[in-house]
Amino acid sequence: MFRISQYLHALEPSVGNTPVRPAAPLAGMQGPVVIWNLVRRCNLTCKHCYATSADKDFPGELSTRQVMETMDELYRFGTRVLILSGGEPLMRPDIFELSHYAKQKGFYVGLSSNGTLITEQNIHAIKEVGYDYVGISIDGTRQTHDTFRRKLGAYDESIRGIRLCHQAGIKVGLRFTLTQDNQYELPELLALMEREAVDKFYLSHLNYAGRGNKNRASDLHHQMTRRAMDLLFETCWSDVKAGRKREYVTGNNDADGVYLLYWAQKNIPRHVEALQQKLVRWGGNSSGRNISNIDNLGNVHPDTMWWDYTLGNVLQRPFSDIWMDTSDPLMKGLKQKHRPLQGRCNLCQHRNICGGNSRTRAWQLTGNAWAEDPGCYLSDVEIGVADLPERIPVTAYAGRIKKAVV
């Protein structure tokens, strides 16, 4: 996750005297952030769902006791942040029991929901948990969102969920996955954020996992991505200068950090040196390092986009043992300070900022986890290379390919 607001507020800390919350809860934490898909069942079948969720039971999911025992082990390991996800987490009958347990242990707890099941009947229970943050997905205006989510009326139900959270005093965020189908609706989504007094805007670039991989042909061309990021940076900077507390973050494309640096050179050049130092300290992609995933069956993955690569299972080995085991070739590479990147990513002058970006896009398109990330939208001039072979094209999904960590 790339916290745009955090970096821009740090450049103008005196403006408005309203800095956004810093990136703690990570401060001083030993274990990774755990995004936990507690249930795979969902009342929607979204086109870009990495979990390929559906409205049916998935056998073998962890029991209440098994989840709590794993939470205990995670806390001992040093993890302090849990993002409870699905499927739709509100479809798990014990979601509030598990959430209360996590809060009582001292975890920062976020809830990742599609928002359609947040109602007058359960908003009190949601408030009683004391979630630190509730993220609700909105992928466009009404018709576009309902098409993405494959359910008529999903947009109105999600907006209701946002309003109920806001009325209950719960910090709520809007999550938006950017594709060719909804790119022109980004201005309207940013306006929606203001109208509904949403606290946080999360823009996710399309990553190639689950249905997102099967629909990867809808990913943006690079110039489209650049236009979207220009708008997001400009909107965030306007909020910073006005002293507004809204947060803007992105995910699944760590080239955003480098592009912000180039945006700053054009728009706020006096801050470029300080910004570059902060971005290098950030270091980019955290898969296998500070971000992890446990799926509904207890399988551990380097992050949520690696469901076809399992490191181990919490019912068979402690999470801490799985996470620290670098005998696995993928984890060995991800944990290295200088990842074994190849091609364009290896030659990039900014790899110390982006960390090699998303490895899953390279994995799904080429079968090689260390190949160039086709989602990088920076030009050859910007990354400091010349006379490279043609970029890896984003081809339509045509079935599984042979993969290897080399």
Give the predicted meaning of each segment.
Residues M1-K56, D72-Y75, F319, P393, ...:
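N-terminal pre-core extensions flanking Radical SAM catalytic domains
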Residues N43-A51, G343-T360:
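Local cysteine-cluster metal-coordination motifs and their immediate loop/turn environment
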Residues T64-H221, T225:
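Radical SAM/AdoMet-radical enzyme domain recognition
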Residues E73-G86, A371-V406:
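Short Fe-S-cluster ligation motifs
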Residues R195, K214-R246, V280-G283, N368-E382, ...:
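A structural motif corresponding to the C-terminal lobe/cap of the Radical SAM core domain
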Residues Q223-A274, N299-G355:
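C-terminal accessory region of radical SAM enzymes
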Residues N285-G288:
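Short, small/polar residue-rich loop motifs at catalytic or cofactor-binding pockets
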Residues I294-D295:
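Short, acidic, Ser/Thr-enriched surface-loop or helix-capping motifs
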